[in-house]
């Protein structure tokens, strides 16, 4: 399945919420009418079955983190095999992706831009170049922008934007050095309350 490259607003309208696919320079409401579904009948959102609700939640989370269907299924299987709550394990695996950590540290204005930085070998982990967006970052790992990319305007702008919106507590960043530490894997209480991971567990448990 190919990665979606179409209008970001369409995805946000489909899920009826901000998926954080845009930089956040302007409020999402000023760009997308997220209250209305896409299409000619977008003003009307029909009633959903339990399955439909579960599927929409899975699609929402998958799109937030920019993960393809097969990857997402793999993460779920890995999460189910771990000790603890499967839903929480799933979200933690997604949060530990290198592209997501780069985004959380503020080196990219969106997860898509952060994924591109990783793919273009602009990011290092513990001093070693890593170009795999799905690489799992561990507590204590040092994630940094490589010297060759430090002066990129988009990275400077992304850091400014992150300073405005605030940085999550589980990363510590030196903006001058463009380097950060992934202090710990976030607990469920640290993550978005707008995600109902139990619906995803119910979907995969069918």
From Swiss-Prot:
Keywords of the record: Ribonucleoprotein, Ribosomal protein, RNA-binding, rRNA-binding
Species: Pseudomonas fluorescens (strain SBW25)
InterPro entries, sorted: Ribosomal_uS4, Ribosomal_uS4_bac-type, Ribosomal_uS4_CS, Ribosomal_uS4_N, S4_RNA-bd, S4_RNA-bd_sf
A GO term for molecular function: structural constituent of ribosome
One Pfam family recorded for the sequence: S4
Subunit field text: Part of the 30S ribosomal subunit. Contacts protein S5. The interaction surface between S4 and S5 is involved in control of translational fidelity.
Taxonomy, superkingdom: Bacteria
Similarity field: Belongs to the universal ribosomal protein uS4 family.
HAMAP family, sorted: Ribosomal_uS4_B (MF_01306_B)
Domain S4 RNA-binding residue range list: 96-156
SUPFAM superfamilies listed in its UniProt record: Alpha-L RNA-binding motif
GO annotation, cellular component aspect: small ribosomal subunit
Name of the protein this chain belongs to: Small ribosomal subunit protein uS4
Record's function text: One of the primary rRNA binding proteins, it binds directly to 16S rRNA where it nucleates assembly of the body of the 30S subunit.
GO BP: ribosomal small subunit biogenesis; translation
């Amino acid at each position: 399945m190919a990665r979606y490259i179409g209008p970001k607003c369409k995805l946000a309208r489909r899920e009826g919420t901000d998926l954080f696919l845009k930089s956040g320079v302007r409020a999402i409401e000023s760009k997308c009418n997220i209250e209305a579904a896409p299409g000619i009948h977008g003003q009307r959102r029909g009633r959903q079955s339990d399955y439909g609700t579960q599927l929409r939640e899975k699609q929402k989370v998958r799109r937030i983190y920019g993960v393809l269907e097969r990857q997402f299924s793999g993460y779920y299987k890995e999460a189910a095999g771990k000790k603890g709550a499967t839903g929480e394990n799933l979200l933690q695996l997604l949060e530990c992706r290198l592209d997501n950590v780069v985004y959380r540290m503020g080196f990219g204005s969106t997860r898509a831009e952060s994924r591109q930085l990783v793919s273009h070998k602009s990011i290092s982990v513990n001093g070693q170049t890593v170009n795999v967006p799905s690489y799992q970052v561990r507590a204590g790992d040092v994630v940094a922008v490589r010297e060759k990319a430090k002066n990129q305007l988009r990275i400077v702008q992304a850091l400014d934007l992150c300073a405005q919106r605030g940085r999550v507590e589980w990363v510590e960043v030196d903006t001058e050095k463009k380097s950060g530490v992934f202090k710990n894997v976030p607990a469920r209480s640290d993550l978005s309350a707008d995600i109902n991971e139990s619906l995803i567990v119910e979907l995969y448990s069918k």
